């Protein structure tokens, strides 16, 4: 699929068909595409946590998402995206390069997530980026280290 077609075709999906199975290799392909995005000094601070098992997805929906969003990811594979703090936008001694500081990690993750969702579209899968969630519960559920920020 040509890039312009991907951009024009891609939409946020709020209902997923039952039985539409995403493979581990396809998930890895999406993450590889995400990792090709540029980042601050090539720091590559984005991280992904994948939930594929139906029982785990259902538990995650109940425990970590608002009621509004929980219904939107039924029959879906879930990817949690995070970034490592104090690397993108920072010097080796830990001082911020400018006023944005950790904002650069979030910016870089946005670039990565764009690549990921466009790759998903190319593979025939719809996506929905959800910001309304309980970051603390996600951190616990996915064992996300305190050195990372849960974004979506």
Can you describe what each PLM-predicted range is?
Residues 26-28, 32, 36-110:
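Glycine/small-residue-rich phosphate/adenosyl-binding loop
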Residues 59, 141-152:
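Short basic, glycine-rich beta-strand/loop surfaces that mediate nucleic-acid
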Residues 72, 122, 145-147:
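Arginine/glycine-rich "motif VI" loop of SF2 helicases in the C-terminal RecA-like domain
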Residues 68-71, 140-144:
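A generic local secondary-structure boundary/capping motif
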Residues 77-79, 127, 148-152:
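Structural motif
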Residues 34-35, 80, 97-141:
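Small-aliphatic-rich amphipathic alpha-helix that forms the alpha element of a beta-alpha
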Residues 22, 52-55, 133-134:
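Short beta->alpha linker loops
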Residues 1-28, 150-151:
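Specificity-determining recognition surfaces
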């Amino acid at each position: 699929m040509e890039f312009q077609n991907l951009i024009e075709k891609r939409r946020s999906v709020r209902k997923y068909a039952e039985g539409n199975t995403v493979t581990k290799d396809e998930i890895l392909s999406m993450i590889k595409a995400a990792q090709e995005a540029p980042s601050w000094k090539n720091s590559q601070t984005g991280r992904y946590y994948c939930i594929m098992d139906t029982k785990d997805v259902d538990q995650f929906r109940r425990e970590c998402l608002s009621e509004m969003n929980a219904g939107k990811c039924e029959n879906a594979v879930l990817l949690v995206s995070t970034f490592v703090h104090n690397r993108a936008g920072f010097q080796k001694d830990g001082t911020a390069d400018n006023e944005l500081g950790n904002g650069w990690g979030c910016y870089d993750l946005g670039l990565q997530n764009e690549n990921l969702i466009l790759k998903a579209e190319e593979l025939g899968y719809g996506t929905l980026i959800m910001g309304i969630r309980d970051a603390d519960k996600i951190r616990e559920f996915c064992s996300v280290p305190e050195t990372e920020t849960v974004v979506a």
